[in-house]
Amino acid sequence: MGLTPAPQEGLVINPATDRPLAANDPYFLSINDKLADKGFLVTSTDELINWARTGSLMWMTFGLACCAVEMMQASMPRYDVERFGFAPRGSPRQSDVMIVAGTLTNKMAPALRKVYDQMPEPRYVISMGSCANGGGYYHYSYSVVRGCDRIVPVDIYVPGCPPSAEALLYGILLLQRKIRRTGTIER
């Protein structure tokens, strides 16, 4: 009695032969077409999880300066980021995304790291504004961290001083696209 190896993730198994199928296999394509005609959607669990995760991102504000005003404006009715499934949360333990907006000082850097460490995996960071991206106007000051990416890993950079609410909204859409493309399992 021979044991068959476990199928690799992302492969479809032919029930007749117990062998994996390629995505362009005629058997797989015919099953997919038959189910699509009946209103079913054939997808992998990874794609389903990524789709669900991008539609329900919970964000935490880390507003440090004037960029936080633009971040608040993105939540108002004109831009309404919640229609994209991007809702604010008050606790880092309930958040998937942290938006760092403003000048990060050396004194505030440990607090930023502490909040980041309290977030559950997978977690994402959006750096908003010139000061959060690289120090901005205060780059040469002794008390300013030259970019929050020196403290936490950053996924999306939103440039500007301060960036508009449209720029933040575009950064959110880029983050959702990145999650769909890369997935959350590899992270």
Curated annotation (Swiss-Prot):
InterPro entries referenced in this protein's UniProt entry, alphabetically: NADH_UbQ_OxRdtase-like_20kDa, NADH_UQ_OxRdtase_20Kd_su
Catalysed reactions, as listed in the record: a quinone + NADH + 5 H(+)(in) = a quinol + NAD(+) + 4 H(+)(out)
Amino acids binding [4Fe-4S] cluster: C66, C67, C131, C161
GO CC term, one of those recorded: respiratory chain complex I
Protein biosynthesis as UniProt keyword: no
Cofactor note: Binds 1 [4Fe-4S] cluster.
Keyword Plastid: no
This protein's UniProt keywords: 4Fe-4S, Cell inner membrane, Cell membrane, Iron, Iron-sulfur, Membrane, Metal-binding, NAD, Quinone, Translocase, Transport, Ubiquinone
Subcellular location: Cell inner membrane
Classification via SUPFAM superfamilies: HydA/Nqo6-like (SSF56770)
GO biological process, one term: electron transport coupled proton transport
EC identifiers of the protein: 7.1.1.-
Topological type in the membrane: Peripheral membrane protein
Cofactor(s) annotated in UniProt: [4Fe-4S] cluster
GO molecular function, one term: NADH:ubiquinone reductase (non-electrogenic) activity
NCBIfam families: nuoB_fam, PRK06411.1
Assembly and oligomerization: NDH-1 is composed of 14 different subunits. Subunits NuoB, C, D, E, F, and G constitute the peripheral sector of the complex.
Family of the protein in this entry: Belongs to the complex I 20 kDa subunit family.
Function statement: NDH-1 shuttles electrons from NADH, via FMN and iron-sulfur (Fe-S) centers, to quinones in the respiratory chain. The immediate electron acceptor for the enzyme in this species is believed to be ubiquinone. Couples the redox reaction to proton translocation (for every two electrons transferred, four hydrogen ions are translocated across the cytoplasmic membrane), and thus conserves the redox energy in a proton gradient.
Protein name: NADH-quinone oxidoreductase subunit B
Taxonomic placement: Bacteria, Pseudomonadati, Pseudomonadota, Alphaproteobacteria, Hyphomicrobiales
Gene name in the database record: nuoB
